[in-house]
Amino acid sequence: MNTEVLGVIAQIVLMVVLSYPLGKYIAKVYKGEKTWSDFMKPVERVMFKLSGINPNEEMNWKQFLRALLVVNLFWFLWGMVLLVTQGVLPLNPDGNVGQTAHQAFNTCISFMVNCNLQHYSGESGLTYFTQLFVIMLFQFITAATGMAAMAGIMKALAAKTTQTIGNFWNYLVLSCTRVLLPLSLVVGFILIVQGTPMGFDGKMKVTTMEGATQYVSQGPTAAIVPIKQLGTNGGGYFGVNSSHPLENPTYFANMVECWSILIIPMAMAFAFGFYLKRKKLGYSIYGVMLFAYLVGVCINVSQEMGGNPRIDEMGIAQDNGAMEGKEIRLGSAATALWSITTTVTSNGSVNGMHDSTMPLSGMMEMLNMQINTWFGGVGVGWMNYFTFIIIAVFISGLMVGRTPEFLGHKVEAREMKIASIVALLHPFIILVGTALAAYLFVHAPAFVESEGGWLNNPGYHGLSEMLYEYTSCAANNGSGFEGLGDNTWFWNYSCGIVLILGRFVPIVGQVAIAGILAKKKFIPESAGTLQTDTVTFGVMTFAVIFIVAALSFFPVHALSTIAEHLSL
């Protein structure tokens, strides 16, 4: 047990220590300063020339958003065509068939919004061609989209008064070539050394210890897993994600993959401080996020290492903790750490089954996604926190009788309305979706039965499964309580709608707020200026997040996860 705890501590220390220099590097990349990766400039110039794009052309916030939305629409259409027709495309040695229209709709939107919700099993639901030219492609593009949006916001906030927020295409390419690609190559090499397969052979025929014949999928796993983790994507190459021994072969590989989930979201908080030359503000934001993350880690590690009371009642020893749904080679503590790491971000990959974690662990996993501001997805996680900064600044200003200001710009009714809509949309789409599913399950049993029954675990846990699904979609996370039968017409389409709303409405709102603030007259700091880089303001922001985001969900948790915990 002590060794497992030391492993958890070592992983967290590595994340914290390495996120600082990475954040400094990312800030330099977006500011156009000299870095070690400048050797990529010729490649970038060729890409821009072939695309007919001038990377130095400035965009206002509306042009920036137009480019972002148009390119995502194009990739959605691209993905839909390939997923439906994958059965007749090359690189399909196992003969996997094309996806149905509603499954392709869900899959394509899911990967386009950086969620990677999977209503299919990775090795049988896709071909090598679509793994590379839809899944891996989207995992780079969507991660870079979030990072580009944050870069635009940073540029807007760094300027005293400006009409433009940078060039979306430039930020998109820089995010891929300077950050995501180099880190993916390093992580991919480590995984190959640890035993993750990399090739295009078909299924491998093996004889098990019992003498039976089994066919094991292989493919370009080591190419896809790194960006799956680093881009907070999370979509597993194999159906059981990183609990699969070929996707996550060893404890060291597990450490590297877990580190990969959080390193860029952590670094982005530091990058904000370096970009704006307000390191203290970056430290403050990072500190609040880290505190919330560590609280979750402590709760889940304690819950999972403590074992299941029901098994204790049977007189069965649980020296290794609650091991249902976990891998022996990884242990309960490493699985608990991963469960929090993957849900404080929009990653959603798993190295054990969240459906089998203890009820309070499941509640923490859902609360992380329901709050959706602790580190979050690459770029968009900080942007969600930015929404609550605007709300906290406005409330704080009213409380002390000062005009609300953030970084020298007045926060007025227009920005507050946008921030409020963004903040309230998240709980709204989660709770409405869950309520609709619960209503249909009770009042339309014939429809539910025609779709396979949906729930394998009715009662408290069944409600938790439906709540988790919509929570994961709205937070663009992608993990799930897999007792839910979700590859159906209803779940594919309803989740697809929640995915779109949960991704693009916040991005549009947050970029709009930054663009509107940037155009306002700059107000120099004075003795009456609200200091946003203090511990006091950090606590205020934490309180606003907890009240607005977390408390909205406690009634439904009382009927699901908490009720299940009390029934043990």
Curated annotation (Swiss-Prot):
Organism: Phocaeicola vulgatus (strain ATCC 8482 / DSM 1447 / JCM 5826 / CCUG 4940 / NBRC 14291 / NCTC 11154)
Organism lineage string: Bacteria, Pseudomonadati, Bacteroidota, Bacteroidia, Bacteroidales
Task performed by this protein: Part of the high-affinity ATP-driven potassium transport (or Kdp) system, which catalyzes the hydrolysis of ATP coupled with the electrogenic transport of potassium into the cytoplasm. This subunit binds the periplasmic potassium ions and delivers the ions to the membrane domain of KdpB through an intramembrane tunnel.
Source taxon at top rank: Bacteria
Transmembrane segments: 3-23, 68-88, 133-153, 180-200, 256-276, 281-301, 375-395, 421-441, 497-517, 535-555
Keywords assigned: Cell inner membrane, Cell membrane, Ion transport, Membrane, Potassium, Potassium transport, Transmembrane, Transmembrane helix, Transport
Subunit structure: The system is composed of three essential subunits: KdpA, KdpB and KdpC.
Membrane topology summary: Multi-pass membrane protein
UniProt-listed HAMAP family: KdpA
Family from the record: Belongs to the KdpA family.
GO molecular function: P-type potassium transmembrane transporter activity; potassium ion binding
NCBIfam families attached to this UniProt entry: kdpA (TIGR00680)
Location within or outside the cell: Cell inner membrane
Cellular component annotations (GO), alphabetically ordered: plasma membrane
InterPro entries in the cross-refs: KdpA
Gene symbol of the encoding locus: kdpA
Protein name per UniProt: Potassium-transporting ATPase potassium-binding subunit
